């Protein structure tokens, strides 16, 4: 394979990866944890947070705070895994 063919293939792979990155960015990731529901976009922006009224205890606000934090962190981890898989897919492709 000559250098021009390698450059063309690299550009094609880069374009494909950019398309897939945009698809992940638009995707919604949903995590449900014990009465908490977090919907996060692939851009890592929170779309919605739903909290079950049964969880709201004025005597223990830390419970809800902890559950929200856990759900958000899990959503971020799931998104990061998708991006890592995408990166692995293209880094293992020979040019």
Curated annotation (Swiss-Prot):
It holds the Pfam family YbaB_DNA_bd. One of its GO terms (cellular component) is bacterial nucleoid. The keyword Nucleotide-binding does not apply. Gene3D superfamilies: Nucleoid-associated protein YbaB-like domain. Belongs to the YbaB/EbfC family. Binds to DNA and alters its conformation. May be involved in regulation of gene expression, nucleoid organization and DNA protection. Homodimer. This is Nucleoid-associated protein MARTH_orf159.
């Amino acid at each position: 394979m000559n250098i021009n063919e390698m450059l063309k293939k690299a550009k094609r792979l880069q374009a494909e990866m950019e398309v897939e990155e945009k698809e992940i960015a638009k995707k919604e990731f949903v995590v449900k944890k014990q009465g908490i529901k977090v919907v996060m976009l692939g851009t890592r922006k929170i779309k919605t947070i739903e909290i079950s009224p049964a969880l709201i205890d004025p005597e223990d606000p830390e419970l809800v705070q902890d559950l929200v934090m856990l759900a958000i962190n899990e959503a971020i981890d799931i998104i990061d895994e998708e991006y890592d898989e995408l990166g692995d897919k293209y880094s293992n492709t020979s040019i």
